[in-house]
Amino acid sequence: GYDVLTYDYRGVGSSRPERLRGMEASIRDWALLDMAGVVDWVGAELAPERLFFVGHSVGGQVAGLLDNGASIDGMITMSAQSGYWRLQGAEQKLVVGFHMHVTFPMLTRLFGYLPMKRAGAGEDIPKGVALEWARWCRSRHYLLDDETLPLERYQQFQAPVLAYSVGDDKWGTPRAVDAMMSAYPNLQRSHINPKEVGLDSIGHFG
């Protein structure tokens, strides 16, 4: 069997502070500090013979930014897509575009964080995370257009990557997953249709 470690990024889940307003956090912090810190901790404390990474959505998107990515022996991603709004499913493309240009930035600045729970849409998101996400989603190549990131590390990520997309995922459409995951040089792509695996629906969040 395998030892498995899960964790929450700063500002969400069990890593959320009592007061989210005023918290300093960004998606790059999630990658360069939290995710990289987990990889270092696993190496130091568990010393595994091999380290495999499973990333959903943002987890698969940003793993290529790690300065210790060479420690990862293989990665499987699920619905790790470009968030660029024009690559979303036809039913929600315009809605996502409006949210990323107007609603999310406005609400985030108003509340000091993005109040997703009030809308029944999952976790509240720290201000810096929400604004960075919205900015990337307005850009044609998503985070790959952000020259303040260490983008050269994607080409240095040599571990094999198996990237899945899902037939009924309106966020992670096949072309959105292709657009993001093509940044990894050792990529294998696969697509799952829920009916083929005995499920009625999977979507983006399972």
Which residues are covered by each model-predicted region?
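Short alpha-helix in the alpha/beta-hydrolase fold that links the catalytic acid
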Residues: 159, 172-183
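Alpha/beta-hydrolase-fold enzymes
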Residues: 54-141
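Acidic beta-to-alpha connecting loop that harbors the catalytic carboxylate
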Residues: 167-169
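Active-site nucleophile elbow and catalytic-triad environment of alpha/beta-hydrolase enzymes
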Residues: 136-153, 159
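Alpha/beta-hydrolase active-site loop
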Residues: 24-45
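Conserved alpha/beta-hydrolase
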Residues: 1-18
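Catalytic histidine neighborhood in serine/cysteine hydrolases
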Residues: 182-202
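Short beta-strand/loop motif that positions the catalytic acidic residue
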Residues: 157, 163-165
